[in-house]
Amino acid sequence: MALLPTGPPAPAIAVADSAAAAPRVPTARPLARLTVALQYAPELSTVRWASYTAPGSNVGVQLEYRFAPKWRLSAGVLRSVKRYAARGTDYHPPTQYWTNYYTIDEVEATCRITDIPLNLRYDVLQRARAAVFASVGVSSLLMRQEDYRYYYLYKGNPVARSWGLRRGSNHLLSILNLSAGYERTLGGRWAVQAEPFVKIPLGGVGFGKVKLSSAGAFLSLKYALWPAVAVAR
């Protein structure tokens, strides 16, 4: 007759779950190396931040190249309409221009410009479907049409006079671009982006060599042409 054990049962040997103990391997998400964007931005322009008139606008395209997981270089072409008012003391036309013989009180302007920006972007925060970024760069301005209205006194009476110029001066690397923004992937190769910005003059632009500043917000629809980079999330 077999004897039954009378002592306490032997402790069970715990078997480690190899799946649970294995270290988590980060998964990679694809990031577009080359993207194209359609852009629109309302903006306000001012000379020395003294006054504002009606808003202007920017419409254009941008090509963006990601050369590192958090770094991108972009170039674009924008058709820009800038409206501003300047004091006569901030408007400096060529020496022989007629306004130099009068005391100009104010100049109102509407300028149609080709803006060629070159910007460097850094992603401050990256998530699976979104990114927060900051950007810095420079713009070259090509003056296509400049329309001016001058206000001054003639023999004690207020006078307004208009004048326009087509295909005026070009100003290379004349604007400093600063911006920050938020990008979100919609699905597939599409993304949207919102980007508040300021443009700070590095020199005078236009016929009157005014120090023109602008502020606004770009809204962009982006499409990935070359999705080839991956980063861990």
Q: Over which residues does each language-model region extend?
A:
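Repeated loop/turn-to-beta-strand initiation elements of outer-membrane beta-barrel proteins
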Residues: 70-73, 128-130, 187-192, 227-231
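Extracellular/periplasm-exposed beta-strand and loop segments of Gram-negative cell-envelope proteins
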Residues: 52, 82-112, 143-171, 208-210
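Sequence/structural signature of outer-membrane beta-barrel proteins
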Residues: 41-49, 82-84, 125-127, 143-145, ...
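Residues on the lipid-exposed face of transmembrane beta-strands in outer-membrane beta-barrel proteins
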Residues: 38-42, 61-67, 77-79, 118-122, ...
